[in-house]
Structure formats: C-alpha cells, structure tokens
C-alpha cells in the first residue's frame, strides 16, 4: 500500500473513532458502544440530561473540527507534503481530546481547576491500537505537538519537525479560540487590567494565565497571543475576522494601554508583510 493510501486509511480510522468518542459524551446510543478504557460508561461521569455538560461538549466538538480544518489549510499554505498534511490533520483532530473527559468530570475547561487537558488527552489516546500504525517519528511528533499546544511556551527541542508541528497546531487552535470567545466578549466592567499584565503587553510578552485576576486581564491575554502567532497566514485569518479590534474596543484606553495597543498594531502590520516558511 502506498504511503498516501495508508495515511488516508489511518485518517478514516482516527476520524471515525474521534467522532464516536465525542458523541458518546452526550449520546446514550453512542455511549453503549464505547470502549471500556474510555471510562465514560459510569453514570457518575456521563450526563446526557445535563444541559451544561452537553453544551460544553458540543462546543468542543465543533472546535475540534474547526481546528482540524485550520491545520489542513495552514499545512497546504506552507506547501507540506501530502503525508505531512495528513499528519497535521491528525494532530488537529486529537489536540483537545482530553477536553471531553475533563469537562464531564470537572465541569470546567480551566486546567488550573482540573487537569492539564493536553496531558490528559495524551493519556486518552495512549492505548488506541491505530496509533501504532503511525511511524515512530510521526507518533512522537504528534505527541509533542499535542503536549505543547496549550503551553505558555513550547518545550525546548532541537528537533525542527517537532517544533514546526507544535507551531502549526498552536496557530490553528488560536484562530478558532478567537471565534469561540467572541460571543462572550463584553465591555470593560471597570476593574481594568492588572498592572503587571499591562507591562507584559507593552513589552510584547506572554503571561501566566493562572494569574489572571480581572475580566479585562482575560481580554489582554488574547491580545498578547498575537505575539505568539507563528505564521502570517494565521494572523491574517484572525485579523480578517476583526477579532483583535473587537477586543481592543472592549478595553479602557488610558495612556499606558495605548502604548501597548499602538505597538501591537505596528507589529501586526509588519508580521502580515512577512513570508511564511516551513522549517520542519
């Protein structure tokens, strides 16, 4: 079997499993057919009649397919081989697999109040037989990318392939998170942003998400993300939906904040003018 056919066949197995797995958290019929190792058959961990659980699961189900699509489109933009485009889709497919068990058990997507969903996801897929159909290098790449997709910074590595796929999934994920969060974007409640967050924003740095103290801190974190976007293609997708300016419009604009906002706008203009290069 040619590599293209092998990867497509493997993709079919993975996508069918993932589709069934996601639906098993809110579909009784699907749950009865679930594998025992998924640990979702117990009445203590499954809530078909709980609107909060069902809404949260469906939200992440849609997010999963959106991110998978983003991975595919970004991979094609970067002119990856057909093999690597398929690998990028697989990473997108499983990047948030830990979210479903997390939300059902803990009723939160907040890792600080539950478990690191990336690490939880790696546990969920660890024993899936079809994972062994990937080459050792591809499997290691997939695990590294998923394990680092939500990290503040990517784990140090000399492996350019690991690093490049981690960058790809982080971009694909962020593009859709902006979409997910947009309906919840509200005007400033007057509490403002924490001074240390504003300082980091002005410097173009990332922050420790666990230290967010106000609603405006959360908005500022989304603006700081721009400096962590790896490809101009990704940033263009975000800017075209007006996500950045929408967030800016919901913050107070004192002199210090405007320094950060003006720097951000200049950075965006410069980043969009760059050419994307795949280094993996």
Locations of regions flagged by a protein language model:
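Amphipathic repeat-derived elements
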Residues: 43-66, 133, 137-154, 158
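Divalent metal-dependent phosphate-bond-processing catalytic cores, especially two-metal-ion Mg2+/Mn2+ enzymes
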Residues: 2-6, 56-65, 69, 73-81, ...
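A broadly conserved amphipathic alpha-helix scaffold signal in soluble, globular proteins
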Residues: 72, 119-129, 144-147, 166-170, ...
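Acidic/His-rich, divalent-metal-binding segments that scaffold phosphate/diphosphate chemistry
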Residues: 1-119
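Long hydrophobic alpha-helices with heptad-repeat/coiled-coil character
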Residues: 10-17, 29, 34-43, 148, ...
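Hydrophobic/aromatic-rich structural module bridging two neighboring secondary-structure elements via a short loop
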Residues: 100-141, 152
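Acidic/histidine metal-binding catalytic segments
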Residues: 79-90, 130-147, 162-168
């Amino acid at each position: 079997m040619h590599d293209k056919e092998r990867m497509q066949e493997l993709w079919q197995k993975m996508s069918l499993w993932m589709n069934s797995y996601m639906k098993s958290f809110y579909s009784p019929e699907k749950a009865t057919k679930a594998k025992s190792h998924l640990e979702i058959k117990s009445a203590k961990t499954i809530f078909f009649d709980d609107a909060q659980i069902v809404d949260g699961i469906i939200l992440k189900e849609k997010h999963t397919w959106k991110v998978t699509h983003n991975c595919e489109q970004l991979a094609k933009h970067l002119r990856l081989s057909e093999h690597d485009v398929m690998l990028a889709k697989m990473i997108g497919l499983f990047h948030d697999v830990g979210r479903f068990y997390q939300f059902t058990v803990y009723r939160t997507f907040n890792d600080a109040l539950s478990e690191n969903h990336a690490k939880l996801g790696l546990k969920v897929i660890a024993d899936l037989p079809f994972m062994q159909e990937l080459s050792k290098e591809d499997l290691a790449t997939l695990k590294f990318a998923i394990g680092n997709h939500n990290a503040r910074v990517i784990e140090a590595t000399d492996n350019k392939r690991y690093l490049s796929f981690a960058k790809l999934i982080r971009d694909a994920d962020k593009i859709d998170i902006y979409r997910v969060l947009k309906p919840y974007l509200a005007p400033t409640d007057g509490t403002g942003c924490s001074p240390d967050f504003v300082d980091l924003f002005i410097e173009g740095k990332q922050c420790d998400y666990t230290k967010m103290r106000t609603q405006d801190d959360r908005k500022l974190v989304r603006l700081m993300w721009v400096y962590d976007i790896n490809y101009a293609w990704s940033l263009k997708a975000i800017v075209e939906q007006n996500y950045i300016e929408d967030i800016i419009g919901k913050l107070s604009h004192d002199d210090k904040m405007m320094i950060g906002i003006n720097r951000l706008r200049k950075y965006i203009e410069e980043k969009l003018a760059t050419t994307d290069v795949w280094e993996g």
